[in-house]
């Protein structure tokens, strides 16, 4: 436990890749836990210049919410990191951490698409199937983009960063449109291969018989 707490206070490794966003993590190997990743919750936007890593506690802390969402999505067959633990400290403003199993030698889909587009397009088939499972269960991943998709060394495809995910009461077609729109914006903004967007749109519409 002491070793894990020390990781909470260790300098985090900022995401250096395209679409890495504000995510900062610490990777380590701890006896009894194995290879893990500690996610340090940090703010984005202008507010980060004033309050970078503290949140006002209103309801569940972010780390607990994401932990529970990961349990849920994995339970319906979505490939997401295995949650191990969560922690937060302070009130009414708190810092938060989430501990998950490490995905070995990961590469984001955004990175892959820039160095091996054919492989990235092949991976998109698995991404579409994962998103389809989310839609089937009315789960909307608000911030899903190619930087939040990891490919492990064994070829496994994982969706990350569910801290802003939510159950959506709308019908599946409306949720589908939200996913397509969010994904397209990210691909366009960061000048990733356009086929990433086209394959997401075509794959989801085909799965739901939408023209």
Each model region followed by its residue ranges:
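C-lobe/activation-segment region of protein kinase-like
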Residues: 152, 157-211
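Short, glycine/acidic-enriched loop or turn micro-motifs at the edges of active sites
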Residues: 104, 146, 164
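Hydrophobic residue at the +6 position relative to the catalytic HRD Asp in the kinase catalytic loop
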Residues: 144-151
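Residue immediately N-terminal to the catalytic "proton-acceptor" Asp
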Residues: 137, 142-144
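Active-site flanking residues adjacent to catalytic metal/cofactor-binding acidic residues
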Residues: 38, 142, 160
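AlphaC helix of the protein kinase catalytic domain
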Residues: 108-117
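Conserved alphaE helix
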Residues: 119-130
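Conserved ATP-binding subdomain of kinase catalytic cores across diverse folds
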Residues: 3-106, 132, 136
